[in-house]
Amino acid sequence: MNVDLRLIVRLLLAILLTSLVTTILMGKQIHRRLVKSMVKTTGEKDSLPARQLPKREISPKVADFPPPLTLNQTELDILKIQRNNSFRLPQQEAIKEWQDAIFFKEDSNRRGLGEQGRAVQLPNAKLNPDDFQDFYAELSDRIPLNRSLPDTRPISCRKRKYLENLPNVTVIIAFHDEHLSVLLRSITSIINRSPVELLKQIVLVDDDSNLPELGQQLEEIVAQNFPKIIHILRLPERRGSIKARMEAIRVSSCQVLVFLDSHIEVNTNWLPPLLEPIVINPHIVTRPILDAISRKTFAYAKQNTMTRSGFNWWLESESLPIFPEDKSPDSTPYRTPVLSGAMAIDRNYFLNLGGFDEQLDTWEAEKFEISFKVWMCGGMMLYVPCARVGHIGKRPMKSISSPGYHNFLARNYKRVAEVWMDNYKKYVYDKNPKLYKMANAGLLFQRKTKRNALECKTFDWYMTKVAPDFLKRYLALDSPLVFSGVIESVAFPGFCVDSLNCRHTKPVVLARCTGHNSMPGEHQNWSLTQDHEIQLTNSKDDCLEAQGLRSKSVWLFRCHKNGGNQYWYYNHRHRWIQQGQIWVWCLEAQLASGHKVGKVLANKICDKNQLEQQWKVGRNAPYDPQREPH
């Protein structure tokens, strides 16, 4: 009898367990059916019914896991500039599979218009060249808001697990006149592909949009579908993305802030890889790899090349190869001197740094300000290959009005340079002296005081420790091989090498020097870089090039960084500008008596008695015989 009773009890327990598992699975299936119920739109801006969007509940976070393996500040300071050994974050033990296997499987089986990130073309679709959005809005309206995407992560990411106890997140999206279906697709992808335990809040900041559908219609969609997770913040006047994001931070409530654009689609399991490094040390800032979404076809394309983000002295973004010690495996986060676009950062650390500089106007320079600030003030920035976010690529923006200043880029760049770049700021100003002289950077006392209070490192530390290859690629400070400024003839005082603004069409000439040492004339301002190129300082890619054999003229051509006829060396002892790597040819001035314009010739055999081959160069490299070894 006792045996029969035990069997009955076991059967009852088995039935209860089976019922519990079935309930959980059915709950997930119900949620997925809500997602599947989303239908394609008809192409009209007002035909985006709220029922297309899945409802999402926020589950309370309950966890009591073993502590993660972390880095203290001293360990982080050592790791972030490490060069001799492979760069690795601590390998964690208490790990969890965060990827939703059921959703991933269903997503991979979907077919239809735009599904799997495939290109879509409408026969009669046209792009208005004056369209603010600069993409096919009609096409976006046809593609499902919750469309499936290809898994573009490296293979090694697909089996990777992450810490069980990760912080919750506020996603911040600032927008101005974003097309409604594009904005809703951004939101839908975030909600569908983020663990409910982690995604607590999305703050949408409307930066004074004019499109009517972004008003009441957006409010109704959010109220009906996401009342507990999405908060819409309306700004009464246009303030720019920098100030808009800071307004969102003030209403955020989570431990980690994630900044995203309003025209994105997040990919599979994108969030946990961004959060784990922040748990290891809250001074680590992370960014996903940005895949490309075509503005014409909405095709989703993988970004294959792993690069770091950098800048030139125009403060334009540059892509640079990653350090050799950061290269493998391809699922490992790696260091980058600059982060742009999307970003995940610990809220307390961000606010302790002073947040974004709200005196930066509209957009753009904040990526440099936050990057310099993080690296120089105790933090580290990482790209995370296992986190992928698709981004609609738009053409370079046309000139737009600024809510606060008529030339906001010059103001922004000067403000960042004055606060963070120390002596290196002159290389930014050298690119356009007149512009930066007129630019008003605003009041800087508070930002400089904050930097001093944080005991941040110098910009020279940043250039030599964080981005040492910048000094090889671009103009270096106080290098014996480098000059910046005029190239004045010793034989013909007051005459300088002049491009005459005839790029690629005529040779450079010897002409009367214009300007003065502290501000050379626009067409007489030259820089000898550590690539041994003599660049026209006010142009980012025009270099002096010797033409043909001996006694030939010198022209201005596009810089190619391959040496050869664009390779120059300044010999301080003899004041020669030598051409080529055998150092037997010299630049020579020729000026006939009574003439106002002379010739600049290359490939003349160097002769120390030939005064026409001697040049006074720049304002950073005065003649000093002790600096010349031969």
Swiss-Prot record:
One Pfam assignment: Ricin_B_lectin
GO molecular function: carbohydrate binding; metal ion binding; polypeptide N-acetylgalactosaminyltransferase activity
Gene Ontology cellular component annotations, sorted alphabetically: Golgi apparatus; Golgi membrane
Cytoplasmic topological segments: 1-6
Glycosylation sites: N72, N84, N146, N168, N525
Disulfide bond residue pairs: C157-C386, C377-C456, C496-C513, C543-C559, C586-C606
Keyword tags: Disulfide bond, Glycoprotein, Glycosyltransferase, Golgi apparatus, Lectin, Manganese, Membrane, Metal-binding, Signal-anchor, Transferase, Transmembrane, Transmembrane helix
Stored Gene3D superfamilies: 2.80.10.50, Spore Coat Polysaccharide Biosynthesis Protein SpsA, Chain A (3.90.550.10)
Pathway linked to the protein: Protein modification; protein glycosylation
Protein origin, superkingdom: Eukaryota
Uppermost EC category: transferase
Record SMART domains: RICIN (SM00458)
Chain residues that bind substrate: D207, R238, S262, W363
Domain Ricin B-type lectin residue range list: 483-618
Residues given in the record as Mn(2+) binding sites: D261, H263, H391
EC number(s) per entry: 2.4.1.41
PROSITE patterns to which the protein is assigned, alphabetical: RICIN_B_LECTIN
Location in the cell: Golgi apparatus membrane
SUPFAM superfamilies xref list: Nucleotide-diphospho-sugar transferases (SSF53448), Ricin B-like lectins (SSF50370)
Stored CDD domains: beta-trefoil_Ricin_Pgant8-like, pp-GalNAc-T
Region (Catalytic subdomain B): 333-394
UniProt comment concerning the protein's domains: There are two conserved domains in the glycosyltransferase region: the N-terminal domain (domain A, also called GT1 motif), which is probably involved in manganese coordination and substrate binding and the C-terminal domain (domain B, also called Gal/GalNAc-T motif), which is probably involved in catalytic reaction and UDP-Gal binding. The ricin B-type lectin domain binds to GalNAc and contributes to the glycopeptide specificity.
Family: Belongs to the glycosyltransferase 2 family. GalNAc-T subfamily.
UniProt-recorded name of the protein: Putative polypeptide N-acetylgalactosaminyltransferase 10
Provenance organism: Drosophila melanogaster
The organism's taxonomic lineage, starting at the top: Eukaryota, Metazoa, Ecdysozoa, Arthropoda, Hexapoda
Gene name for this UniProt entry: pgant10
